[in-house]
C-alpha cells in the first residue's frame, strides 16, 4: 500500500429494527436509499454523500440469516469500512503484512432504475476483530459505484455531504492506533492531550478513553441522555 486509505462507509447495525431506524434517520433529515436486499440475506438502507456514506444494515424481522457478525453484535455503529479498488490486491497486501483476515467474498443487491432492475455488486475482505475491539473493520470494492452514489440520493434536508469525523471510545487508544497502522502505515497519527487522531484521506478518526470522552463531550452526553456513560 503506497498511500493513505479512504473511508468508504460506516456500517450501523440495526438487527431487526430497520423500520424504526429508518424513521429516526429520516427525522434527522437524511435521504435514505430504497431498502436493499443483499444476496447474503441482510437488508440495508444507505445515506450517501459525495465520497462516502452511512449504511443501516440488519435483517428482516422473524427471518433467519447466516451473518453472525450482525446477529451477535450490539446495535449501533460497528463497521469501519475502507475503500478498495481491487479486493484481491488488498487481500494480497493484508497477507503480506501478516494481518489476520477472512477470504474475499462477493455479493449483490437488486436496484431498480426507471423500472429496470440492475444489480449493485460488491467484493469485501474482513479483518479479524483483534484490530479494533469495538467492531468490524473491512475493505469494500464497488464494482458498480454508480448504483450506490446516485445523484438523487446525495441531497439531504440536513445538508450533510460527508463524514467529517469519527469518534471511537477505546480502553487502549495507543494499541488500537498501532493495529490500524498495520493496515496502512501511511496514516498520519497525531497525539493530543485528550485523544489520538488518525487522518485518512477523506476523514479523521479520533480515539478517546472514556474519561476524556466525557470531558470533551459532556453536553452531548447530557443532551442525548446517555445513562450508560
What are these model-predicted stretches?
Residues 20-75:
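Glycine/small-residue-rich interface belts in oligomeric ring/scaffold proteins
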Residues 12, 18, 70-74, 129-132, ...:
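Short, low-complexity cationic-aromatic patches
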Amino acid at each position: 500500500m503506497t498511500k493513505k486509505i479512504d473511508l468508504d462507509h460506516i456500517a450501523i447495525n440495526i438487527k431487526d429494527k430497520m423500520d424504526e431506524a429508518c424513521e429516526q434517520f429520516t427525522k434527522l433529515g437524511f435521504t435514505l436509499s430504497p431498502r436493499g436486499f443483499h444476496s447474503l440475506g441482510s437488508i440495508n438502507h444507505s445515506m450517501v454523500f459525495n465520497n462516502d456514506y452511512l449504511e443501516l444494515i440488519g435483517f428482516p424481522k422473524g427471518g433467519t440469516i447466516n451473518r453472525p457478525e450482525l446477529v451477535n453484535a450490539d446495535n449501533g455503529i460497528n463497521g469501519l469500512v475502507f475503500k478498495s479498488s481491487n479486493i484481491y490486491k488488498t487481500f494480497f497486501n493484508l497477507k503480506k503484512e501478516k494481518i489476520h483476515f477472512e477470504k474475499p467474498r462477493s455479493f449483490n443487491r437488486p436496484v431498480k432504475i426507471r423500472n429496470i432492475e440492475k444489480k449493485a455488486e460488491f467484493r469485501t475482505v474482513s479483518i479479524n476483530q483483534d484490530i479494533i475491539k469495538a467492531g468490524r473493520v473491512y475493505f469494500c470494492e464497488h464494482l458498480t459505484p454508480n448504483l450506490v452514489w446516485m445523484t438523487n440520493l446525495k441531497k439531504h434536508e440536513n445538508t450533510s455531504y460527508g463524514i467529517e469525523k469519527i469518534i471511537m471510545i477505546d480502553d487502549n487508544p495507543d494499541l488500537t492506533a498501532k493495529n490500524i497502522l498495520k493496515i496502512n502505515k501511511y496514516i498520519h497519527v497525531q497525539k493530543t492531550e485528550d485523544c489520538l487522531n488518525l487522518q485518512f484521506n477523506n476523514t479523521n478518526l479520533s480515539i478517546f478513553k472514556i474519561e476524556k470522552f466525557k470531558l470533551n463531550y459532556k453536553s452531548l452526553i447530557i443532551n442525548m441522555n446517555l445513562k450508560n456513560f
